[in-house]
């Protein structure tokens, strides 16, 4: 998708922005999800590589790395004792809500980030700066 987008923008000499959705697990590993963490780490490096390659064409490439977010799939986990204990270890003492991704996404999609490329924005309630 990124390649097709970039080719189209380059052919038209139009600027653009690509926003990848990575994960904090691309920066910090945990047990039992090796394939997931490897794929997200790869996506972070792809973001940086594409940013370098596409900058001269005025195409910015950035990523958002969400932490733990409540979804329909995992909502019941966060109600368990293990889930509540994990939430207590997140500095903001809560998991993310999908609306928490709106601001960072709008930032990266707008001209407010015109001088950002190759960046990865962590949206994790402070998870990565804690000693979880």
What are these regions (language model features)?
Residues 2, 39, 47:
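Active-site helix of classical SDR
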Residues 23:
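Residue(s) in the substrate-gating loop at a strand-loop-helix junction
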Residues 60-66, 70, 109-112, 122-124:
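Conserved SDR Rossmann-fold cofactor-binding beta-strand/turn motif
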Residues 28, 105-106, 117-132:
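Short C-terminal tail/terminal secondary-structure segment
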Residues 90-101, 112:
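A conserved structural motif in NAD(P)-dependent oxidoreductases
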Residues 28-34, 56-57, 93, 111:
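Active-site loop immediately N-terminal to the catalytic Tyr-X3-Lys motif
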Residues 7, 52-56, 114:
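Alpha-helical segment proximal to the catalytic Tyr-Lys
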Residues 27, 44, 65-76:
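Short, flexible catalytic-loop segment of classical short-chain dehydrogenase/reductase
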